[in-house]
């Protein structure tokens, strides 16, 4: 494994790896130890006490963070009829039908989120092998397969983030940028944590929030005291 640079080592030395910090302390420390020369993202990782091999312990959804993520999301909407005008009025970057299926099949990916009306999923389904591995396939659980394209687009533009538990039960999500105030990041963190707490499967036993850490792009991880959640 490659050795981390001097700048990273200096930042990491400010974090006590044996200590678990409060949410407030962890966010402040993560910002202070950011070493990127750009406005880095602030990311959180929740390790949940779930078994993702069981169908009733799958966790996936989306939440609108009160302060957004600081990132502008480009939205592609698959729709037809009057839903095209509705999506455009809501601020969608690209709206169309089969022509966008063909563009994507040819390697076009100038978008961050895909929304589709249910009557377009027959066409969008052709892109499963392409969009699926990139996490871009529309899904009812995340509100991206819907007839209410206005609400879907507006929420994404307002700072909606999708979350999904990976094989080890880990949920990764961005809660903002280093330029955000501590209060904005804390509020976003609490919103996400609350949604995950409510999503706890009834069949999940033992400790639910096994570990939580916050980090910035390229920065060291800071552990959060799960007892404080």
From Swiss-Prot:
<dbReference type="GO" id="GO:0006417">
    <property type="term" value="P:regulation of translation"/>
</dbReference>
<dbReference type="GO" id="GO:0015934">
    <property type="term" value="C:large ribosomal subunit"/>
</dbReference>
<keyword id="KW-0678">Repressor</keyword>
<comment type="subunit">
    <text>Part of the 50S ribosomal subunit.</text>
</comment>
<dbReference type="InterPro" id="IPR028364">
    <property type="entry name" value="Ribosomal_uL1/biogenesis"/>
</dbReference>
<dbReference type="InterPro" id="IPR016095">
    <property type="entry name" value="Ribosomal_uL1_3-a/b-sand"/>
</dbReference>
<keyword id="KW-0820">tRNA-binding</keyword>
<comment type="function">
    <text>Protein L1 is also a translational repressor protein, it controls the translation of the L11 operon by binding to its mRNA.</text>
</comment>
<comment type="function">
    <text>Binds directly to 23S rRNA. The L1 stalk is quite mobile in the ribosome, and is involved in E site tRNA release.</text>
</comment>
<dbReference type="GO" id="GO:0006412">
    <property type="term" value="P:translation"/>
</dbReference>
<protein>
    <recommendedName>
        <fullName>Large ribosomal subunit protein uL1</fullName>
    </recommendedName>
</protein>
<dbReference type="Pfam" id="PF00687">
    <property type="entry name" value="Ribosomal_L1"/>
</dbReference>
<keyword id="KW-0687">Ribonucleoprotein</keyword>
<dbReference type="InterPro" id="IPR005878">
    <property type="entry name" value="Ribosom_uL1_bac-type"/>
</dbReference>
<keyword id="KW-0699">rRNA-binding</keyword>
<keyword id="KW-0694">RNA-binding</keyword>
<keyword id="KW-0810">Translation regulation</keyword>
<dbReference type="GO" id="GO:0003735">
    <property type="term" value="F:structural constituent of ribosome"/>
</dbReference>
<dbReference type="InterPro" id="IPR002143">
    <property type="entry name" value="Ribosomal_uL1"/>
</dbReference>
<dbReference type="InterPro" id="IPR023673">
    <property type="entry name" value="Ribosomal_uL1_CS"/>
</dbReference>
<dbReference type="InterPro" id="IPR023674">
    <property type="entry name" value="Ribosomal_uL1-like"/>
</dbReference>
<comment type="similarity">
    <text>Belongs to the universal ribosomal protein uL1 family.</text>
</comment>
<dbReference type="GO" id="GO:0019843">
    <property type="term" value="F:rRNA binding"/>
</dbReference>
<dbReference type="GO" id="GO:0000049">
    <property type="term" value="F:tRNA binding"/>
</dbReference>
<keyword id="KW-0689">Ribosomal protein</keyword>
